[in-house]
Regions:
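C-terminal subdomain of alpha/beta-hydrolase-fold enzymes, centered on the catalytic histidine
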Residues: 401, 413-472
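A structural motif corresponding to the C-terminal end of an alpha-helix
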Residues: 258-265, 358-371, 447-458
Length: 472
């Protein structure tokens, strides 16, 4: 594969290329300091091309631009959508679905893509014909920063120092786990159960450790008194306030009912959704729950996989079959596909051990799940994540940018860093622990379909059947 990819386009180049608006540093506080996820120098704009109708006049010129292998493309659409990908990934997608949109030397024919994009499939289909407004080429992470240093150290721990130098971040299961861990560890709240914090008003003056300890005391008291509690479990790349904060603000009457019903015993389970699998999340949640606790669960998106696991019983006989039976990984390169298959085999072996531990802990703790509301869960897998990870994450990032809660929020910056790292490294969705479980071909979907659920749970499911259009 060539180390460069050629963009063939008619556009107006900008002399001093800016960063895309989506990736500019926006902090809520004027004295917030540097962004730990997007530090100075992490992104450098190499080029920006205007392709919209207003730019395709006298100033537009036909040109060819070389994108380096370690650079990222940011493609802005006129409808507000943004795609962050690598030029080589876009080129590979076109080679599979629309080779006529590539030149004789593999160059990407953007003029033809603009005209014919609506008829394409795969990644190119998301660049709806005629809607591309700007294309940026960005140099990403020219030198290691604290996140990369932490990821390499974590990788050494995960491999126990054996051969970690030969493992690349983002192109192996452990390398991707370490990279996602290094990003997620910088989030404001560490994993664990917390007492619900009011969306408005000053935060409690206590550390995460103190807050978790306070929640533990309350949960122990509730279990001893036989009182029910309510636990919220958030979704991918989010937090409890990000997933459920509007419920308290916009549905005040409903929230008052919940507070009365549970006498204020409402809790938030914060967890890592990328570096950890739902099995790891479920074990963390269970570890924080006192034995025999009566609880109700409300989950959103990927959090539904965590909630489902907590509701299982007697699934030991299914654990040995927790492995991928499908040879396809979405990789067009045979060597890359072989690596992904081998990595998945090892990862699923580790997850079988985790499932055995979870089954034992469920039998010991015996949580009493009384009510369970599951919203938009990928219980049988989601093809939104299985087609192309760049598209899925770019769409997620675009959506988060429309939610006021995430404006200037460190969680939003963390998501940007994740999307950029995955794009520049062409990371497979199968190698991201928290996303692999959401793929339709993942053994998680089969386990949740076949495993018995404890009787007596009142369950409500809010679901839909959608097919994405454009980037969203």
């Amino acid at each position: 594969m060539s180390s460069t990819t050629i963009l063939d386009l008619t556009a107006t180049p900008q002399e001093q290329a800016p960063l895309p608006a989506l990736l500019r540093n926006v902090r809520r506080a004027t004295d917030a300091g540097d962004d730990p996820f997007m530090p100075p120098g992490y992104l450098q704009a190499r080029a920006c091309f205007e392709l919209g109708p207003t730019a395709r006049g006298a100033t537009a010129v036909s040109q060819k631009f070389e994108v380096q292998a370690d650079e990222v493309l940011v493609i802005e659409l006129a409808d507000g959508g943004v795609l962050i990908t690598s030029a080589s990934e876009l080129q590979a997608s076109l080679a599979r679905s629309r080779p006529d949109l590539l030149g004789s030397q593999g160059e990407i024919l953007f003029d033809r893509l603009r005209a014919d994009g609506a008829a394409t499939r795969g990644l190119a289909a998301d660049l709806v014909g005629g809607l591309i407004s700007r294309v940026f080429a960005l140099a990403v992470g020219a030198s290691d920063d604290a996140i990369i240093s932490d990821a390499r150290a974590k990788l050494g721990e995960l491999t126990r120092g054996r051969g970690s130098e030969a493992i690349e971040l983002g192109v192996s299961w452990l390398g991707t786990k370490a990279l996602m861990w290094a990003i997620e560890k910088r989030l404001e709240r560490q994993p664990g159960i917390y007492c619900w914090q009011a969306v408005q008003g000053a935060a409690a003056a206590e550390s995460d450790e103190q807050a978790r300890a306070r929640a533990q005391r309350e949960l122990q008291a509730a279990a001893a008194a036989g009182e029910p509690v309510l636990v919220f479990v958030h979704g991918t790349g989010s937090s409890t306030r990000g997933s459920f904060g509007d419920l308290q603000l916009d549905e005040r009457e409903l929230w008052s009912i919940l507070e009365r019903e549970f006498d204020g015993r409402i809790y938030a389970f914060e967890h890592r959704t990328l570096s950890e699998s739902p099995i790891e999340n479920a074990r963390q949640l269970l570890a924080a729950l006192p034995a025999g606790l009566r609880l109700s669960l409300v989950t959103h998106s990927r959090g539904g996989l965590v909630g489902d696991l907590i509701c299982l019983e007697n699934f030991d006989s299914l654990i040995e079959h927790y492995r991928s039976d499908l040879p396809a990984t979405g990789e067009t390169d045979t060597a890359a596909a072989t690596v992904v298959q081998r990595e998945l085999g090892d990862a699923h072996g580790e997850q079988r051990q985790l499932l055995r531990a979870l089954a034992s802990e469920l039998a010991e703790k015996k949580p009493v799940v009384q009510r369970y509301v599951r919203v938009a869960s990928p219980a049988q897998g989601t093809r939104l994540a299985s087609g192309n990870l760049d598209v899925f994450l770019s769409g997620l990032l675009t959506l988060l940018g429309q939610i006021p809660f995430f404006f200037g929020n460190p969680l939003y910056s963390a998501c940007k860093r994740v999307v950029l790292e995955i794009a520049r490294r062409r990371t497979s969705a199968h190698l991201v622990p928290g996303i692999e479980a959401m793929l339709p071909e993942s053994p998680m979907a089969r386990l949740l379909r076949d495993a018995p659920v404890r009787p007596g749970i009142e369950m409500a499911v809010i679901a839909g059947d959608i097919e994405g259009g454009g980037l969203l």
